[in-house]
Amino acid sequence: MNAIWIDEQLETSARVQNSMKIEREDHKLEKRLCREVGRAIVDFNMIEEGDKVMVCVSGGKDSYAMLDILLKLQKRAPINFELVAVNLDQKQPGFPEHVLPEYLSKLGVPYHIENQDTYSIVTRVIPEGKTLCSLCSRLRRGILYRVAGELGCTKIALGHHRDDMLQTFFLNMFFAAKLKGMPPKLVSDDGKNIVIRPMAYVTEKDLTRWAQVQDFPIIPCTLCGSQENLQRKQVGNMLRDWQKQYPGRIENMFSALQNIVPSHLMDSKRHDFKGIRTTGVADPEGDKAFDAEEFMQAAPAGRAVIGINPLAPG
């Protein structure tokens, strides 16, 4: 009897300790997410005093997490800014229209649902079997720009993360022959909106875990999510394989996006190769043309490069 009682006590104690460990890990994850989003906001001056930020919420894990983190930072930020969540209901068959309004109402955040049947347009114009993403994205972009103006928003926040940015860089290199990525902040192509990506420093792995912790009511994208062999998926798999084989490579590649040397590429629009002249003065930072390149064995890249104070201590 005593042995059974002791076993039960030990089992209960183990469960309590495991629960406490999970809580600690979840708290660390929350702090890391807030810190990394805060750093991006500060690094690129994404949100300023008096801004009204339109937070685009699709129903996926990334946009849910972005809204959640921005709400947390809003409470502790040294500046005042507004948030309004916006969802574009594209009238996809089976789309659960009630999910987002119920979630956002419960959250207590101002929100707007824009109803536009882009689904019919995309499926009518794009041949069966072809990727729908490009046209869908263009239609969605135009609508969201208009809505931002109607709501008086000064910034549009998108939920792209670090992995998205790296994938875009390689997609442009492989399929468009461009060294072009996904900027953390830009002026929209209509010249009227500033678009920000507050989760530029956040990993998809952390977002996946946070979605589980918060139990977000995820809405799958049935319009394009079922299409296999998309180029982005292929590039994503390639990057994940690299990271498994060479841990730290993803961090180094991401840091490289912030450490560009135009004079060592081949774009004459970015560097005046034709006008190069000798100066007769030694430059310790100059190029050693005949020396082999020296590379770090392991660079702590990623977070060391972006170590700037977030909006508030966390």
Curated annotation (Swiss-Prot):
A motif (PP-loop motif) lies at residues 58-63. Catalyzes the ATP-dependent 2-thiolation of cytidine in position 32 of tRNA, to form 2-thiocytidine (s(2)C32). The sulfur atoms are provided by the cysteine/cysteine desulfurase (IscS) system. Its EC number is 2.8.1.-. GO terms for biological process: tRNA thio-modification. InterPro entries: Rossmann-like_a/b/a_fold, TilS/TtcA_N, tRNA_Cyd_32_2_STrfase, tRNA_thiolation_TtcA_Ctu1. Keywords: 4Fe-4S, ATP-binding, Cytoplasm, Iron, Iron-sulfur, Magnesium, Metal-binding, Nucleotide-binding, RNA-binding, Transferase, tRNA processing, tRNA-binding. Pathway: tRNA modification. Binds 1 [4Fe-4S] cluster per subunit. The cluster is chelated by three Cys residues, the fourth Fe has a free coordination site that may bind a sulfur atom transferred from the persulfide of IscS. The thiolation reaction likely consists of two steps: a first activation step by ATP to form an adenylated intermediate of the target base of tRNA, and a second nucleophilic substitution step of the sulfur (S) atom supplied by the hydrosulfide attached to the Fe-S cluster. Homodimer. [4Fe-4S] cluster binds at residues 133, 136, 224. The gene is ttcA. Pfam families: ATP_bind_3. Belongs to the TtcA family. HAMAP family: TtcA. GO terms for molecular function: 4 iron, 4 sulfur cluster binding; ATP binding; magnesium ion binding; sulfurtransferase activity; tRNA binding. GO terms for cellular component: cytoplasm. It is found in: Cytoplasm. This is tRNA-cytidine(32) 2-sulfurtransferase. It comes from the Bacteria. It catalyses: cytidine(32) in tRNA + S-sulfanyl-L-cysteinyl-[cysteine desulfurase] + AH2 + ATP = 2-thiocytidine(32) in tRNA + L-cysteinyl-[cysteine desulfurase] + A + AMP + diphosphate + H(+). Its cofactor is Mg(2+); [4Fe-4S] cluster. It comes from Polaromonas naphthalenivorans (strain CJ2).
